Each structure stands twice: as structure tokens, then as C-alpha cells.
Amino acid sequence: MMTLSMLAAAFAGCLGGDDDDEKTTVKIGFLNPITGPLEPNAPVFKWSADEAISDLTEMYPDYNFELIEQDSGCDGAVAGPAAQTLVDSGVYAVVGAACSGASMAANGVLSAAGIPMISYASTNPGLSDASAYPMFYRNVPSDAIQGPAGADMMTDAGVADGALAVFGMTNDYGAGLADAVVDAWGSDKLCDVGRYDYAETDTDFQAIADQMAASTTCTAVYLSSYIADAALIIEALADAGWSGHIFGGDGPAGEGMYDEMEDDSLLNGMTVTQPRAGSSFGDFSAHYDANAPSGGIK
């Protein structure tokens, strides 16, 4: 919701009074990970976008706001064509994508068409380069900030030098965040398993989980992951008999983690970083309580 509100502020000068009786339609694109590793969060993202469209309609009654949703797939190969579909649909601006690689691919299409985009979740540090990614904005901090914050979190939790392993996907989000965490923590202060890199499509983590269980030094692990892979890793660690402290970034921080787990009690004690509410958070909590389904957003 906050992302769309920021778009409204950006377009406020363009959305002044309209002398025509017929309302002008303003199309806003929305790149949502309907498929892929962040799919469990897609319903929440969509609900928030719909609520924001309702707010915009109240703020600017002379306009009809239309949300055009496309699947980003949490994948550049999906998000690029989706962005072109939004361009062809005549959108003024785009909200998204969630995943960094998807935002990078979409930006190449959208910026070429002169369409700005604002992401609600893409944190790769490289996206801060305005020359490489023109007309890209985000309302979440870069992993250049989240990485050191994660290191501080683990220090405060009592993780000792030489006790931490870092698991990270090799995609734009996972590698960027894992790099930031290792840089802040110190590569020479990792445990004997060290850093483990894997493809986001990997589904078998039993071998690395067995290494963690056999280690005499690895009492903590940081997951630079999404939801689906984090669940598989956590379950593999439990199956191997490892019972240390699990940490993570914003990727596995959503409530979708509970739906993905076969045994959500394994999440007890897991500690993650996540951007806090900003000064423009407004009355979101009250808005959610008044409008969200009683059984939660599914």
C-alpha cells in the first residue's frame, strides 16, 4: 500500500482537477510473484495493492485507477516479458517487482519506454546505480544496509566468531545479501562449513545439512534465501539432527514461511531482519484490521 501511495504522491501534480465530465483512467502496473519461490506471499502483495488502489480512488475522485497485474515469476526471464505486456497495456507506472533479478530485467524494458517503477521488496545493492537502472525506485533498504544489520543481529544474539555458516542462493538477491553478510561478519570468522552457495531451484539440502550436523563449530546459520528453499533447508537441518540458531534476511521473513513448513514448530527461535515501518506508514495497521478477511489473506 505504501508503495502505491508513494506513486500517488509522485503523480499528484499530474492528477489535478479535471474539467471533463468523463473520468480519466490511470493504469498502474503491478508485478507480483504469482509463481516462483515467493508465491506464498503473492496473495498478501495483491491484497495490499488492491487496498492502495481503493485509497487512490478516494484521494482523486476525478480519476479511475486500474491495477494491471502480471506475474513476475520471481525470475528475470518471466518479468521481462511481463513488463513488456504492461508497457503494451498503457500503464503510467509500475509497482514491483518483488525479487531483485525480476526488477533488473523489468527495468530494462520499462525504462526504455519511459515508465518508472518502484519496488516493494527488491534489495540488491546494484539497483542503487541510477545509470544502470534508470527510473527505478524502492521503498525498502539496500542489502548494503541489511547485511551489516544482520551481522549486528547475530552478534547481539551471542553468535561467536567461528560459529556461523552462511547459506545463499546464487541469484541476484541471494548472492548480494550473502556477500553483504559475509563482508560485515568477516569471511575469516565463519565456521568450518563456511559459505554454501546453491541455485534457487535446488531442492535437496541433505548433504550440506549432514555436514552441519557433523561440524563441531557450526552452531548458527544465516539463510540468504526465499521462502520455499528456506523451508527445505530448515527441515533438512532438523532431519540431520542439527539444532543451532537459524537466522535470515527479509526473504523468509513473511508469514508464508508457516504455510510452507511441514512442521512449523521448527521455526521457533528463528531470527530475521526485515525493514521496519517508515514515517509514511500511516494508519496501515488500523486499515488492515478493518478490511482484511477474518481468516487472514490467502
Which residues does each predicted region cover?
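Immediate post-signal peptide segment of exported/extracytoplasmic ligand-binding proteins
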Residues: 19-30, 59-64, 155-162
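Extracellular/periplasmic Venus flytrap/periplasmic-binding protein
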Residues: 81, 125-126, 134-241, 279, ...
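Active-site-proximal beta-strand/loop segments in catalytic clefts of secreted hydrolases
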Residues: 31-34, 70-73, 96-100, 120-123, ...
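Beta-alpha junction/loop-to-helix N-cap segments that form part of ligand/metal-binding clefts
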Residues: 23-25, 40-47, 54-130, 139, ...
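Secretory targeting signatures
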Residues: 1-25
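Periplasmic-binding protein-like
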Residues: 86-98, 118-120, 163-168, 193, ...
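Glycine- and acidic-residue-enriched helix-capping/strand-helix junction motifs
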Residues: 35-47, 172-176
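Extracellular/periplasmic periplasmic-binding protein-like sensory domains
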Residues: 234-298
